[in-house]
């Protein structure tokens, strides 16, 4: 997703672009929003901009290999974490975001302004509360310990980090 595709939040987008252009990229950022207002879209646009090999006019080019991978949410150095639970779309005993990544990609590519209820429907856990469990923290630590596949930044985008339990949060610290 390019900044040009983000609805609203122009001031925030401008600040993110300025930080990236000046080389002041924070090791962690928290984007807080009212549900469906665009924090995920901004995060996706920012990570795409950071990894774009040919940014143009304060936005990612949308054409380089990194941008094409980001458009499909398949960039090898960008990982996604979101609340999950056991459901009919996975056979994993301890599901992680990776268990449902196919459904996440479909949902986020179609509409990066989706809600928690949209996510629960997409991954088949409408009647359960999603959470980010310790197994997820272990998976993220493992992924981040690997060498980057491409040039640019490695990133983890957490959707609804407030769904992380205390043990998971402590593990990530």
Residue ranges of model-derived segments:
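Clamp-loader machinery-focused feature within the broader ASCE/P-loop NTPase space
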Residues: 2-163, 167
């Amino acid at each position: 997703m390019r900044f040009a595709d983000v609805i609203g939040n122009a001031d925030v987008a401008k600040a993110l672009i300025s930080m990236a252009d000046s080389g002041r990229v924070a090791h962690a950022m928290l984007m807080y929003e009212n549900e469906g207002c665009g924090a995920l879209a901004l995060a996706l646009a920012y990570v795409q901009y950071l990894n774009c090999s040919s940014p143009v006019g304060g936005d990612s080019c949308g054409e380089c290999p990194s941008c094409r991978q980001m458009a499909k949410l398949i960039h090898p150095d960008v990982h996604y974490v979101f609340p999950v639970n056991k459901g009919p779309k996975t056979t994993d005993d301890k599901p992680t975001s990776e268990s449902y990544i196919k459904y996440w990609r479909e949902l986020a590519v179609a509409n990066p302004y989706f809600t928690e209820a949209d996510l629960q429907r997409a991954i088949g856990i409408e009647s359960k509360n999603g959470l980010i469990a310790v197994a997820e923290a272990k998976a993220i630590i493992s992924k981040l310990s690997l060498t980057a596949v491409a040039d640019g930044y490695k990133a983890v985008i957490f959707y609804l980090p407030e769904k992380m339990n205390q043990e998971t949060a402590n593990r990530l610290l």
